[in-house]
Regions:
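A residue-level signal for conserved active-site and pocket-lining positions in enzyme catalytic cores
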Residues: 50, 300, 340
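Charged/polar positions within long, soluble alpha-helices
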Residues: 88, 165-168, 172, 243, ...
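Composition- and surface-driven signal marking solvent-exposed, interaction-prone regions
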Residues: 169-182, 253-254, 317, 352-356, ...
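Hydrophobic (often cysteine-bearing) scaffold residues that line and stabilize catalytic clefts
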Residues: 26, 30, 46, 156, ...
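Non-catalytic regulatory/linker segments of enzymes
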Residues: 7-10, 293, 321, 355-367
Length: 367
């Protein structure tokens, strides 16, 4: 039965490729910036923007975006709760003197979809019973944290994303010398990678393979000067995670697409989380990365303020046409938000330089 419910390879590939489409320029810095700018107009959240792109903004079928299937949209619906319901924090006041000088944590968006896509989500969930829909859209709060339920395809995509985040991002960080042999091991042990834990991993591997390499040896090889050895170790970590993925049944849901979920078996789930913590500690939260994220936050906010101040002057012709057709101020702000959210880092930087930086930008330079 389970094999019949698993998504077609093309479908799950499409879900994986599509799930981050809504991320704005400069990653979380851009997301915080747009949520700050849109706090009085419905907010902003990257995953919610993905749903908006797929069903409205992408130019394939007028008014329906890429016109994807219901199951694909269910697969990318990570947080089935509207912004207005998920946002419990009181809005912080705007800072008109220096609008870009904000603390990221004050304007971090809730996990949600945008209110503009309520009808889309209603259509996505239409095949499910009222009870299933109610449980999915009203996730419980456990230990002060909202616990979201996922559909089967979403759980597979999330699992793949987590494995990539912890292993392939580690590979990139090692290549860039952001993570070294010297700083990796203290951070890994602090995250829970003790000798006893590594021994537990080895016991699991030994029970499955006649010939095996200890997990500590695999991790040490990540720092080999030989790139082939490093690649082989990365491949081994990915393989260990993949072969320990399982499907479990959540009895609170009736429909199998909601009741069945993919998960990573212990202790490999802990290993994945430990590697993820290393990346967060040594890379994501490092001052060098945070400096760039803050700079991106400033670029996005100042672009938004310039575009909303004089949209006819600064918006591209097609975008301005959409802007003037918007039914109210809230919808007009959303047009500006959509335009900026669709930029790459490079495009946003070039547009910023053209508008704000003397001696930079030219009418002959294409964006």
């Amino acid at each position: 039965m389970i094999s019949r419910l698993l998504p077609d390879p093309h479908l799950i590939s499409a879900i994986g490729l599509a799930h981050d489409l809504g991320h704005p320029p400069y990653g979380h810095g851009g997301e915080v910036a747009l949520n700050y700018c849109m706090q009085e107009y419905g907010g902003f959240e990257g995953n919610g923007q993905t749903l908006r792109i797929l069903t409205r903004l992408e130019k394939y079928v007028r008014g329906y975006g890429l016109n994807p299937t219901r199951r694909l949209l269910l697969g990318i619906l990570k947080y089935p709760m509207p912004y207005s319901q998920a946002s419990s924090r009181l809005a912080k006041p705007l800072t008109p003197e220096l609008p870009w000088l904000i603390k990221s944590s004050d304007y971090k968006p809730p996990n949600c979809y945008l209110n503009t896509e309520r009808n889309v989500v209603k259509w996505i969930l239409a095949p499910f019973s009222s009870e299933d829909k109610d449980k999915l859209t009203h996730p419980p709060v456990i230990g002060g944290k909202q616990i979201y339920y996922h559909a089967l395809d979403t759980s597979i995509m999330e699992l793949a994303d987590d494995i990539c985040y912890s292993v392939h991002d580690l590979e990139d960080a090692i290549s860039l010398k952001l993570v070294t042999r010297e700083n990796f091991w203290p951070a890994f042990r602090k995250a829970g990678g003790t000798t006893a834990f590594l021994h537990l991993i080895d016991e699991k591997i030994k029970s499955r393979f006649e010939k095996y390499e200890s997990i500590s040896t695999t991790l040490k090889k990540l720092f080999s000067p030989n790139s082939c050895i490093r690649k082989a170790s990365i491949g081994r970590l990915i393989h260990l995670c993949i072969i320990h993925c399982r499907i479990r049944h959540n009895k609170i849901f009736e429909h199998p697409l909601l009741s069945l979920n993919a998960y990573l078996e212990e202790p490999f789930a802990q290993l994945q989380k430990q590697l993820e913590k290393v990346i967060v500690t040594l890379v994501i939260k490092s001052p060098n990365v945070q400096h760039l994220e803050f700079k991106g936050q400033r670029i996005v906010i100042e672009l938004f303020k310039a575009l909303e101040m004089d949209p006819e002057r600064f918006l591209p012709e097609s975008t301005f046409k959409t802007y003037i057709q918007a039914k109210n101020e809230k919808a007009q702000k959303r047009v500006i938000c959509d335009y900026i959210a669709g930029m790459t880092d490079e495009y946003a930087a070039k547009l910023y330089e053209r508008i704000f930086c003397p001696h930079r930008g030219s009418v002959f330079e294409r964006l």
